Amino acid sequence: MMNAGERFARAVAAKDAVALAATMADGIDFQALTPGRHWQAVSPREVADEIVLRFWFGPGADITGLAGLTTGEVGGRQHVAYRLQVTRDGREYLVEQQAYYDTEGDQISWMRVLCAGYRPAPVPVPAVATVR
């Protein structure tokens, strides 16, 4: 069974507003830092519909893959880290986010997110010779 952090990350990757909001408790204490901005919300729908799926990954951002996902615990607080492959304006990016959270039951009640921003995806370098 997936924990709340993994469900959150997978819902972000799927751009599924209903599933994303369902990971969070009513009255969530949500704060996040992205390059250039601090975000706050107390409603699961505000986090899902406005912050994550409108501003961070709006209609022009196509999430093409979940490149990494780890979960853990730090002194009783839960942790999830995930890396998304995103195409925006014809360019490929990686977006990594780290989140620490607490739960009430199976829903996130407190969450802090730190985002690396849209970072250019590495371009594979073609081999120039075959090594034997």
Please identify what each model-predicted range represents.
Residues 1-2, 83:
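A short, structure-level motif marking secondary-structure boundaries and short turns
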Residues 2-27:
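Short acidic-aromatic low-complexity motifs
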Residues 17-19, 25-73:
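A solvent-exposed, acidic/Ser-Thr-rich amphipathic alpha-helical stretch
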Residues 49-132:
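A beta-strand edge to alpha-helix "cap/lid" segment located at domain peripheries
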